[in-house]
């Protein structure tokens, strides 16, 4: 065999020989999923949670079925299921007194309600706003979800007079 042919044979053998640290032709695959939604979620605040005039040392409760309950209208994709979650304050701050004047606020396991498609709290489903819940938008003609929240304020006997405020944040995301 000629020397050139032998060099080519050795070169081919070196190229085809497995090498340490290099992949040996293993392949894999994954599936791809995409869930396209037809509509973004829009939240409209309809009413603030309002306790009205509160007496020092006397706790006051507003039920989610009461006229002073906080209320939202949520619009989204027809019949879509969602997760409803709240970020709740532990206290309300007096905006007229010296800094540090606060009043506790609490929420029970039945302080919130939701209703599919209908703005009627009497037929709404109660849930714990601390834990959140799942809900569902209405059918094509009425793709809405309505939310209500109540709570209890507990002013101390030494509470400073003034207006106490806080914020309740509601989050709604598709499942």
Can you say where each PLM-predicted feature lies in the sequence?
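Bacterial N-terminal signal peptides that target proteins for export
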Residues: 1-9
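Terminal beta-strand-rich extracellular "head" domains
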Residues: 94-136
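Bacterial N-terminal signal peptides
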Residues: 8-17
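N-terminal small/polar-rich segments of proteins
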Residues: 22-102, 134-175
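Intrinsically disordered, low-complexity regions enriched in serine, threonine, proline
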Residues: 3, 16-19
């Amino acid at each position: 065999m000629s020397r050139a042919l032998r060099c080519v044979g050795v070169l081919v053998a070196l190229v085809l020989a497995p090498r340490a640290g290099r992949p040996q032709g293993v392949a894999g695959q994954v599936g791809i999923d995409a869930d396209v939604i037809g509509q973004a979620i829009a939240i409209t605040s309809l009413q603030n949670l309002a306790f009205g005039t509160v007496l020092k040392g006397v706790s006051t409760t507003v039920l989610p079925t009461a006229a002073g309950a906080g209320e939202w209208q949520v619009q989204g994709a027809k019949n879509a299921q969602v997760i409803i979650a709240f970020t709740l304050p532990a206290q309300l701050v007096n905006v007229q007194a010296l800094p540090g004047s606060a009043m506790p606020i609490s929420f029970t396991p039945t302080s919130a309600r939701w209703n599919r498609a209908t703005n009627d709290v009497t037929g709404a489903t109660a849930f714990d706003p601390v834990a959140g819940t799942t809900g569902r938008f209405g059918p094509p003609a009425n793709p809405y979800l309505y939310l209500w929240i109540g709570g209890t304020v507990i002013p101390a006997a030494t509470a400073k007079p003034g207006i106490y405020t806080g914020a309740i944040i509601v989050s709604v995301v598709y499942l």
